[in-house]
A protein has these predicted regions:
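Inward-facing hydrophobic residues that define packing positions of alpha-helical scaffold repeats
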Residues: 75, 112-113
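Short solvent-exposed coil/turn linkers within tandem alpha-helical repeat scaffolds
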Residues: 24, 79-88, 102, 116-125
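N-terminal positive-inside, membrane-proximal cytosolic segments immediately preceding the first
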Residues: 1-31
């Protein structure tokens, strides 16, 4: 009987504790779950964006150098929709080169300037800066 009484006391203590702190425990569990699933969702989104950007960049790198319209459209999409990826800066360099070859130095400078200011990788920024300086020296 003492064993049952002791168990009943523990149950009553737990019920009292739960009544006092139960809301906070549930709130903490909800915050942890929300944070966990939020982080997982963000990682999935970033992975999906990188995969889509990679696919677009692959298409861009395989495009015919003379197909300026295709190069411009793919580069614009990469630079607009996927500007947070490393592919955007690289796309800007590719379209700048294509514009330069097509004697559209104004657009080439604009693309190089975009790459210099917005690329995620420092080497891409440096390349854009050097190419922009070389174009300005030619003038």
């Amino acid at each position: 009987m003492a064993y049952d009484l002791e168990e009943q006391e523990q149950i009553d203590e737990f019920k009292a504790w739960w009544k006092t702190y139960g809301k906070y425990v549930l709130l903490a569990v909800a915050v942890v779950l929300f944070t966990f699933f939020g982080i997982q969702g963000w990682r999935y989104y970033q992975h999906r964006q990188a995969l889509m950007a990679s696919t677009q960049y692959e298409t861009l790198s395989q495009a015919d150098a003379k197909d300026l319209k295709l190069i411009r459209s793919i580069s614009a999409e990469l630079m607009d929709k996927f500007s947070g990826t490393a592919y955007a800066g690289r796309a800007a360099l590719i379209v700048a080169k294509a514009n330069y070859i097509a004697n559209d130095s104004k657009s080439a400078k604009a693309q190089l300037d975009w790459a210099r200011n917005n690329a995620q990788e420092e080497p891409i920024k440096a390349i854009a800066q050097l190419q922009l300086a070389a174009m300005q020296l030619e003038e």
